[in-house]
C-alpha cells in the first residue's frame, strides 16, 4: 500500500482559476506601474497600524473632552456644601463648633436631630386585639401526646 501525501496538487489550478488569479498590485493599476511590490505590501501594513494618525486622533479627542468639561463647568453652578457630622473621638467638640457657627448653626441642628430620630430603636406597641389573639390560639390547640403514646379511643 502506498503512503498518502498530506498535500495534494490535484485540482489546485482549477481552484486558483475559480477565484481568479490576481496579478500583483503594481501590475493591476496604471497609477502603480513600476512601483516595487514589496513597498506596496509594506504600505498596506502601515495603513493598518497607522501610529501617527492614531496619536493625532487621541490628541483631538483629549481636546474635545477638555472643551466639554469646561463648557459643563460654565453651565453648572456650584451648589452649597451640606455640613457633614464627622464621626470619631472629636465629634462632641465639632458638634459644638457647628452649632455655634452663625450660618451653619440652624442647618446642623436639624440635621443632627434627624440623625438622632433615625438611629432610635422603635418600640413595638401591641394593641389589645393582638395581645389576646396569641393566647386564644394556644388554648385552642390540643395538648400533644408523648411520641410513643397511642391516641385515646372514644367509647361508643
UniProtKB/Swiss-Prot annotation:
Assembly notes: Component of the large ribosomal subunit.
Keywords tagged on the record: Acetylation, Cytoplasm, Methylation, Phosphoprotein, Repeat, Ribonucleoprotein, Ribosomal protein
N6-methyllysine PTM positions: 5
Stretches the record annotates as Disordered: 1-35, 116-156
Presence of the UniProt keyword Zinc-finger in the record: no
Cellular component terms per the entry's GO annotation: cytoplasm; cytoplasmic side of rough endoplasmic reticulum membrane; cytosolic large ribosomal subunit; cytosolic ribosome; large ribosomal subunit; membrane; ribosome; synapse
Pfam families: Ribosomal_L29e
Protein name: Large ribosomal subunit protein eL29
Modified residues (Phosphoserine): 31
Record gene name: Rpl29
Any single biological process term in GO: translation
Compartments, record wording: Cytoplasm
Gene3D superfamilies associated with the record: 6.10.140.1730
Classification via InterPro entries: Ribosomal_eL29
Sequence repeat residue intervals: 129-136, 137-144
GO molecular-function term, one example from the UniProt record: structural constituent of ribosome
Highest taxon in the source lineage: Eukaryota
Species: Rattus norvegicus
Comp. bias (Basic residues): 1-26
Coiled-coil regions listed: none
UniProt record similarity statement: Belongs to the eukaryotic ribosomal protein eL29 family.
Keyword Acetylation in annotation: yes
Its biological purpose: Component of the large ribosomal subunit. The ribosome is a large ribonucleoprotein complex responsible for the synthesis of proteins in the cell.
Region (2 X 8 AA tandem repeats of A-X-A-K-A-P-A-[KQ]): 129-144
Transmembrane stretches, start-end: none
Skewed-composition ranges (Low complexity): 134-156
Modified residues (N6-acetyllysine): 33
Amino acid at each position: 500500500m502506498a503512503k498518502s501525501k498530506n498535500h495534494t496538487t490535484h485540482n489546485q489550478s482549477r481552484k486558483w482559476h475559480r477565484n481568479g488569479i490576481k496579478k500583483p498590485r503594481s501590475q493591476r493599476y496604471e497609477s502603480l506601474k513600476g512601483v516595487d511590490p514589496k513597498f506596496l505590501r509594506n504600505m498596506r501594513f502601515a495603513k493598518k497600524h497607522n501610529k501617527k494618525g492614531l496619536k493625532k486622533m487621541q490628541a483631538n479627542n483629549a481636546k474635545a473632552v477638555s472643551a466639554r468639561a469646561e463648557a459643563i463647568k460654565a453651565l453648572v453652578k456650584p451648589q452649597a456644601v451640606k455640613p457633614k457630622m464627622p464621626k470619631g473621638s472629636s465629634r462632641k467638640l465639632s458638634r459644638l463648633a457647628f452649632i455655634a457657627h452663625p450660618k451653619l448653626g440652624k442647618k446642623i441642628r436639624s440635621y443632627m436631630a434627624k440623625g438622632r430620630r433615625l438611629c432610635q430603636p422603635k418600640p413595638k406597641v401591641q394593641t389589645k386585639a393582638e395581645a389576646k389573639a396569641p393566647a386564644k390560639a394556644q388554648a385552642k390547640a390540643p395538648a400533644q401526646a408523648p411520641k410513643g403514646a397511642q391516641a385515646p379511643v372514644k367509647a361508643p
